[in-house]
Amino acid sequence: MIQRQTYLNVADNSGAKKVQVIGIPYAPRKYATLRDVVTVTVKEALPQGNAKKGKIYRAIIVRTAKEVRRPDGSYIKFDDNACVLLNQYGEPLGTRVLGPIAREVRNKGFTKIASLAPEVV
């Protein structure tokens, strides 16, 4: 479960390393989970990256440490909370996605992110 003020790892090569959730605009609830789009601000970034510290982006959550129940009854959880930064058109900011991502991201319509990921779980 991701809420406001939660720190997330960034799972792409956009240059950002850590981001903080500042809003959950598209979810009519307090918490965000896998495949939700959230508003984030960059807290740690590489100096030569595209994403700069202090900038505000939208991001999709691709991994959560809290387990999520799937319709078939199985559960999925990861070791960390991670997201992929998006540009204003909903496309990934980076050109690579690092680590596995959840199948729910592809089912939501983010097929570009799923094709860049090394593994879809």
Swiss-Prot record:
A Pfam entry, by short name: Ribosomal_L14
UniProt superkingdom: Bacteria
Keywords per UniProt: Ribonucleoprotein, Ribosomal protein, RNA-binding, rRNA-binding
A GO molecular-function descriptor: structural constituent of ribosome
Regions that span the bilayer: none
One of the GO BP terms on file: translation
Signal peptide: none
Gene3D superfamilies, per the entry: Ribosomal protein L14
SUPFAM superfamilies: Ribosomal protein L14 (SSF50193)
GO cellular component: cytosolic large ribosomal subunit
Record-linked InterPro entries: Ribosomal_uL14, Ribosomal_uL14_bac-type, Ribosomal_uL14_CS, Ribosomal_uL14_sf
Subunit structure: Part of the 50S ribosomal subunit. Forms a cluster with proteins L3 and L19. In the 70S ribosome, L14 and L19 interact and together make contacts with the 16S rRNA in bridges B5 and B8.
Family: Belongs to the universal ribosomal protein uL14 family.
HAMAP family: Ribosomal_uL14
NCBIfam families according to UniProt: rplN_bact
Function, as annotated: Binds to 23S rRNA. Forms part of two intersubunit bridges in the 70S ribosome.
The name this protein goes by in its record: Large ribosomal subunit protein uL14
